[in-house]
Every structure is written in structure tokens, then in C-alpha cells.
A protein has these predicted regions:
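Rossmann-like NAD(P)-binding element
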Residues: 77-119, 123-126
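Acidic, Ala/Val/Gly-enriched low-complexity intrinsically disordered segments
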Residues: 2, 10-11
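Rossmann-like NAD(P)(H) cofactor-binding subdomain of soluble oxidoreductases
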Residues: 105-168
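A general structural motif
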Residues: 23, 46, 96, 121-122, ...
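NAD(P)+-binding Rossmann beta1-loop-alpha1 motif at the extreme N-terminus of oxidoreductases
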Residues: 15-73, 93
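Conserved anion/nucleotide-ligand pocket segment
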Residues: 169-176
Length: 176
């Protein structure tokens, strides 16, 4: 089912801390339900969003591009028109001010190792759910002698309860 292109996203939210860079581009790493939901929600709020994960998610990503976005159903009704869905981690990380890692904690080390070579000074990494993932990321970055100045943060719990009901469609269980 192709999504209507008549709904345009709102202007990007102004996320700014004194003297900090405005966040406009977000990369979501995680091709599961929470990654899809987060990418769609951020895109619906007006952010430029890239969704990224491994090759096993390539089919889902092709469907997102074919549909023109990710459909949110349930307690949130919107179409998240993400810019790119890719398996290319280097492309996904490049230029993102925020990298939101929405994967299960057993994958934290894998993701830290994959993104480390491509990180840039000033990027922010948000790990969701955290489960002390910031410690894993820091340990991996130290082992790899990664010298880029990035900010590591984490959030306990997922952004919202959700279920991937079909490719390019997520049902959200609570209002945001």
C-alpha cells in the first residue's frame, strides 16, 4: 500500500542547549519495532531521519522506500517520511547530530564496534533502552582507541510500547 505524500512533516523542533548545535538530522539504528517507531515519530516531528541496520533488514527497508515512509497506527496516527533506510552504517552515521540506537542490549557491543570508525566530533549517541549500554559503548571506544568527542547518553525503557504489524507499519500502544 503506497502512502499519500500530501502530508508534509512539521518544521524541525528546536532542540537547543545554550551554545549547542541545533539537532536536525537523526540516525536511528535498529530495524525492529522500536527502531521503526522512533524513526517514524522523529520524522513526523520534522527531523531528517535515516533508519539503519544490518542486511537482514534490507527487505523491510525496501518496503519503507516503496511506501514513502512508515505508517504509525494505534495511539499515534501519522506517516513518518524518513529520508533514507539503509544497511550502510557509514552513510547512516555521516552528518547525523543524534544517533539513536534502538536495539536490544545484547547488540550494544556490536553496534558500538560498527559505528566507531565513522563517528565525528560533536555527535550525540542515545542508547534506548540503555541497560548501562553507555558503559559498553565507552569500553569498546576505549579498546578501539577512538578519539572522537561524542556524547553518550541512555534512556531506560523504550520510547513507546509498539509492534511491527507489517513492513513499514508500526502499531503504537500508548500516546506520546
Amino acid at each position: 500500500m503506497a502512502l499519500s505524500r500530501s502530508c508534509l512533516p512539521a518544521a524541525p523542533l528546536k532542540i537547543r542547549k545554550r551554545g549547542a548545535q541545533l539537532i536536525e538530522k537523526i540516525t536511528v539504528i535498529g530495524g525492529g519495532a522500536t527502531g521503526h517507531a522512533a524513526a517514524a515519530i522523529y520524522a513526523d516531528k520534522g527531523f531528517r531521519v535515516t533508519l539503519c541496520d544490518g542486511e537482514r533488514f534490507a527487505g523491510r527497508f525496501k518496503q519503507i522506500e516503496a511506501n514513502g515512509g512508515i505508517l504509525l497506527r494505534g495511539k499515534v496516527h501519522a506517516i513518518g517520511r524518513i529520508e533514507t533506510a539503509t544497511t550502510d552504517i557509514e552513510k547512516a552515521v555521516a552528518g547525523a547530530q543524534l544517533i539513536a540506537v534502538h536495539v536490544m542490549s545484547p547488540r550494544h557491543e556490536e553496534i558500538a564496534r560498527k559505528i566507531a570508525p565513522y563517528l565525528q566530533d560533536g555527535q550525540h549517541i542515545l542508547i534506548v533502552p540503555g541497560n548501562l549500554g553507555a558503559f559498553i559503548f565507552r569500553r569498546v571506544f576505549d579498546e578501539l582507541h577512538m578519539t572522537k568527542k561524542v556524547t553518550l547518553t541512555e534512556q531506560e525503557g523504550n520510547l513507546c510500547p509498539c509492534r511491527l504489524t507489517q513492513d513499514a507499519e508500526v502499531t503504537v500502544g500508548l500516546p506520546l
